[in-house]
A protein has these predicted regions:
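Conserved RecA-like helicase ATPase core segment
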Residues: 2-11, 24, 44, 225-327
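Conserved helicase C-terminal RecA-like lobe
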Residues: 161, 362-374, 387, 394-656
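Helicase P-loop NTPase motor core
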Residues: 26, 30-38, 42, 103, ...
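Hydrophobic residues in beta-strands of the RecA-like P-loop NTPase core, especially within AAA+ ATPase
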Residues: 216-223, 247-248, 584
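A basic/glycine-biased coupling hinge at the interface between accessory DNA-binding modules
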Residues: 2-4, 21-24, 43-214, 238-245, ...
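Acidic, low-complexity intrinsically disordered tails
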Residues: 1-2, 657-699
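Motif I (Walker A/P-loop) of helicase-class P-loop NTPases
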Residues: 35-44, 69-70, 228
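Phosphate-binding P-loop
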Residues: 15-21
């Protein structure tokens, strides 16, 4: 039985899922079922091609996508437990796995630290001796692009085009040296260091090629130079037939600003002449009218590959364009339309999304939604692991795992307060710098007594001894001879530092209660995972191993499902999502397309507009049933009302003029709102709330 009939795949999907004669590139248009193809292919490799699950790796760009993919694969396998043997992870999680296994080859401790964004910002701030946040971020951006482009500090210095570049390259050199002293890596190092290791050590590279015999890469258009090089190093070798499948869409490449290069798709055909190209063009998400608008916009970009999305969902509702007097009116109109449309259809709030180019556009929309009492969530908000109270606890775990981690030492020793002030840390830091040792080691180094009086040294040594005791216990967790477990170690740590008391002392009761509940949720998760997972079967998930992984996580597993609320999101954060009804707002020149940063290294005017056009395409293709695109004739900027021009992208949608502009009845004003409500009450409504009935006009 073919995959077409057995699993309901269309012909190109089936071909992609079963192709096994070498490297394969699947060009998967928006909504074309790419995740289904990847999961079916992995099942095919295991069930029909004799691959052991432990020799297959699938790489994604988010932890959520990786978890969902693994769950779907388990449902396809005759033995679902085999899914646990797969490597389904982000690029960065795979990098951690490689570095943890090969740390000694790179001069790293097994328990190296992973610096979070705040740590990296503070380090650059210290090295640059500036408090200019914009300058610090520019330097960070330059260093990230250098690392992702596999450019070392000396090469960056040699190619510096101006004095600003020279300054950034010098800071880059000091930054790399400081991380090495901390026995720490940053986010970009998690891929850069494995690439450098595989290039320089053939034996290690061969070992990992034997471990990972088939590689699948999702969202290939979002890979940077470093990630592409890692893929090549894993799949190529003397006498080795490259076995991998890359899945991507050149029309959805929207991350050039963080080093991704769309050229990686093209480069595949050069580096792998036998590459099989398969196109997925049938869209299972959107109506024909929505796809026509998307195809019309993206046709203005030069094409790496010809591709035309189509759908069997029928024409659907016309795409509407709304020209609003200002952003207040835009926000109010959208809120009222959502309220009316939801009432008419008995729809859920979660069926609606409001998408915009930048976070700043969301503020006025939030006010309008609150006025209409419409619940909403904001994508791309603060990660659970970015909360201050969680970072406080993580700093202890990082220090237990790696006593050379100076940023973790500084945060932990000062939170909660234990009599260690800034002056004490300055003296300790100077002493540690003199001897080229960590702050932790300096606490016990001979000669420190001459620098710090006993009253200042005593709390430091008490703290350091406490960390040493916890480290010894955490190392023993899981051993048969040890009575300790992760829960006991964590409970004793929390009791000793008295963090709950600190919260209620430092914050008002309601805020302290919320923060403490977050800490309890986090420690509960650690207790479960730190003993080898729910069933204790994962030896890699010891308490100290988890300390390394926490830096990569964006959410707790098993937290509450998405609430019934309107989704507000930037266009970048909306990628991969879909909604029955979408409002795409602020489609004006200077916003979408964005005016851009003239100092951004990757930007030329043409490249920037092309990427912005792809962003518009991503926004359009999030919509399943209805799409409203709005722009304002005036918009508030820095408390001033400025004139705005309609975006070129609206013109490029090539909408029929009669369809594109809402009728007077469709624009809800205070005068006609009551009449509209009466009409809705008199109108027969659908008998169910699943929005599967024939679309009606939005009133």
């Amino acid at each position: 039985m073919s995959y077409v009939t057995q699993y309901g795949l269309n012909v190109p999907q089936s071909e992609a899922a079963t192709y096994m004669d070498g490297p394969c590139l699947v060009l998967a248009g928006a909504g074309s079922g790419k995740t289904r193809v990847i999961t079916q292919k992995i099942a095919h490799l295991i069930e029909h091609c004799g691959y052991d699950a432990k020799h297959i790796a699938a790489l994604t760009f988010t932890n959520k996508a990786a978890m969902e993919m693994q769950e779907r694969i388990a449902k396809l396998l005759k033995e679902p437990k085999k899914a646990k043997q797969l490597t389904v992870s982000t690029f960065h999680s795979l990098g951690v796995k490689i570095l943890r296994s090969e740390a000694h080859e790179l001069g790293l401790k097994d328990r190296f630290s992973i610096m979070d964004s705040d740590d990296c910002f503070s380090l650059v701030q210290d090295l640059a001796a500036t408090t200019d946040k914009q300058l610090i971020r520019r330097i960070q951006g330059a260093m990230s692009l250098w690392k992702n482009g596999l450019i070392d500090p000396e090469s960056a210095l040699r190619t510096a085009a101006n004095e600003d570049d020279v300054q950034a390259a010098r800071i880059y050199r000091s930054y790399v040296a400081t991380l090495s002293a901390y026995q720490a890596v940053d986010f970009d190092d998690l891929i850069r260091l494995p690439v450098e290791l595989f290039r320089s050590n053939e034996a290690v590279r061969d070992k990992w090629q034997r471990k990972l015999r088939y590689l699948l890469v999702d969202e290939y258009q979002d890979t940077n130079t470093c990630q592409y090089e890692l893929v090549k190093l894993l799949v190529t070798g003397i006498g080795k037939k490259p076995m991998f499948t890359a899945v991507g869409d050149d029309d959805q490449a929207i991350y050039a600003w963080r080093g991704a290069t769309i050229e990686n798709l093209k480069q595949l055909q050069i580096d792998f002449p036998d590459l099989k190209l398969i196109k997925l063009e049938q869209n299972y998400r959107s109506s024909t009218r929505i796809l026509q608008a998307a195809n019309a916009v993206i046709s203005n970009n030069p094409k790496l590959f010809e591709k035309q999305l189509w759908s069997e969902h029928g024409l659907g509702d016309p795409v509407k364009v709304m020209a609003m007097p200002d952003d207040d009116e835009e926000a109010e109109q959208i809120a009222i339309m959502i309220s009316a449309h939801r009432f008419e259809r008995r729809a859920k709030f979660s069926d609606y999304a409001i998408l915009y180019r930048g976070n700043h556009q969301g503020r006025v929309i939030e006010q309008a939604l609150r006025k209409e009492r419409i619940p909403y969530t904001i994508s791309g908000g603060q990660s659970f692991f970015d909360r201050a109270e969680i970072k406080d606890i993580i700093s202890y775990l990082r220090l237990i795992a790696n006593q050379d981690d100076d940023p973790a030492f500084i945060r932990a020793v000062t939170t909660p307060k234990r009599g260690v002030g800034q002056s004490t840390l300055e003296v300790l830091g100077a002493f540690a710098g003199q001897w080229q040792i960590s702050l932790f080691e300096a606490v016990f180094k001979g000669g420190i007594e001459a620098k710090l009086p006993q009253r200042q040294l005593a709390p430091l040594r008490s703290f350091a001894n406490f960390i040493n005791q916890l480290e010894a216990r955490a190392t023993r967790v899981g051993r048969a001879s040890s009575g300790d477990n992760a829960a006991q170690v964590l409970d004793d740590m929390m009791k000793e530092i008295n963090y709950e008391y600190y919260l209620y002392d430092a914050f008002e009761d309601r805020q302290a209660q919320s923060k403490w509940q977050n800490v309890l949720d986090f420690t509960s998760w650690l207790k479960e995972k730190g003993n080898g997972g729910k069933d204790g079967s994962d030896p890699e998930k010891s308490l100290l191993d988890l300390t390394q992984m926490v830096a990569l996580m964006t959410m707790l597993e098993g937290r509450d499902e998405e609430p019934d609320a309107v989704r507000m999101s930037t266009l970048h954060a909306s990628k991969g999502l879909e909604f029955p009804h979408v409002f795409l707002v602020g489609v004006e020149e200077g916003i979408l397309p964005h005016k851009g940063d003239p100092d951004a290294p990757f930007e030329t005017l043409g490249a920037r507009i092309e990427e912005e056009r792809r962003l518009m395409y991503v926004g359009i293709t999030r919509a399943q049933r209805t799409l409203h695109v709005s722009w304002c004739k005036k918009r508030k900027r820095a408390r001033e009302s400025v004139h705005c021009d309609v975006s070129r992208f609206i013109k490029e949608m090539k909408l029929d003029e009669g369809d594109a502009v809402p009728t007077e009845a469709e624009i809800i004003t205070p005068q006609n709102r009551l009449a509209n409500l009466k009409a809705l009450l008199q109108k027969p409504r659908p008998g169910n709330a699943d929005l599967t009935t024939e679309p009606e006009k939005l009133k």
